[in-house]
């Protein structure tokens, strides 16, 4: 019956997944255009940037009073007053795309293959002073527009001084900021006079009353350059898109001279804004199959290689020390214990064998521990498979949100394994409340994450961000969870209860618990946790920086090969360090290894991940909402890391303990 139920659930999941649009693999299903064919231009949300630079009057990069926001805005949010088509149509998106804030719509731009345009009028809008203040604030804080043409992000050309290479960076500026100086007597632009305190920087020459102003210029003209590949016989494919935004102050459409004054929105009056665009086509030798190569830029790979090689050597050294020390010590212990005359010498002996009557004693809160470990195993398998598939190239960045969608599906499927593990561990603890374990394992951790997401959703709603996950999407996720994951989890728990024999211990548990002697300071839980967490954290520290920039600032992350190798190092170090500390604790007659194995394996690394995320905020966070979102999501990431590494530490310790105590003779 259990097998049939699991089989039916898998068939239903296969049916649902098969009805969804297939994942877009590199080199599959290109769109071929003929001359004058329409090329759709889609618009996405406006997102913050990380390394946006202000410029002075000579065009040089200068530092400015820039804040960083961690939420995006809908392109057609009514305060932007962008031109709209006759009928705004939302484009279909994957589940992962919606979760990560994509809001893709059609646009009024008319692009036709090989049909160039010069200063084509788009529309005229009126931007009130209050909305002008809002737009100027986003310009000064480096917000980017994000367009999509034939599945490619409209980009800007970026030069990486470290690698001496150029690449295409997704998105382009909402506007520009010019840093200029003036005195109180000099006439300054209205936008600079009426902006709030953040326009005026702290640099001031009191004697001459010279102030430094940030003048935000709004981009209202777009030079669109489309690169195409000629396939012959009149067939063409889009292989690159660059957009150069220009700010032009004008009183009538049809004039696009860039030598005139730029447009700065007056925050005290209504502003008439004319939007225009130009289109050019450049033939390129780049084939369609390699068009993403220009976007998938690895920032300073030498740092990543250096970090991975160095830490790989550390892991090899650590592994050698741990394995050699344990094998040597255990070999000596086994020989001594198995030759021991229990009647004469047992009371004189010491070491981990003396714990044989307590080492398999059920810990306090065994139900909670089993649920956390099972949830950690579920997350571990999800992360491993997701990174592995991405490293092989199955999850292309051209399929927006595919990674998040696959992670959600895998997490639901691995609910079977997570619940099986949770129930097996609960049997290992001889827990009596198996029904509570069956119900809570698929609900506790996902429910906690859902509540946190809903709470953070309210903060996103407060600032009118496009990152708000719609209620319909949340209900759909919960529906899928109850339809697929929970039945699979129940099946895993029931099978484990009937078929899993982890409750068969190699030694019997005494009725009276053995007193634990005094432990050295470095083996106490908190110091041991802090020491053990250094090694797994070190294996992923470099990759965390790139993951954060991708999550918060809309950068394309495609270094999954580095990430997969780093995750392997994380797994090895978490396992080895926890086993080493568990062994030395047992040698000092501390038989309470269960919670220590989980905490030492997971809490230290999670703590360092959280501290790293806080140190990552060397940039200035803008506003209370941004701080709450950053701390909230960073806490979720750290807690999930704790579950993954904690489950690695616990299972490694459990297998180690069972192995060594099954290898000795106990009467």
UniProtKB/Swiss-Prot annotation:
Q: Which cysteines are joined by disulfide bonds?
A: none
The identity of this protein, by name, is Transmembrane 9 superfamily member 1
UniProt KW Repeat keyword: no
Species the sequence originates in: Saccharomyces cerevisiae (strain ATCC 204508 / S288c)
Provide Lumenal-side residue ranges.
Answer: 23-302, 392-405, 464-474, 549-560, 618-635
Give the highest taxon in the source lineage.
Eukaryota
Its Gene Ontology biological processes?
Answer: endosomal transport; intracellular copper ion homeostasis; invasive growth in response to glucose limitation; monoatomic ion transport; protein localization to membrane; pseudohyphal growth; vacuolar transport
Name the family: Belongs to the nonaspanin (TM9SF) (TC 9.A.2) family.
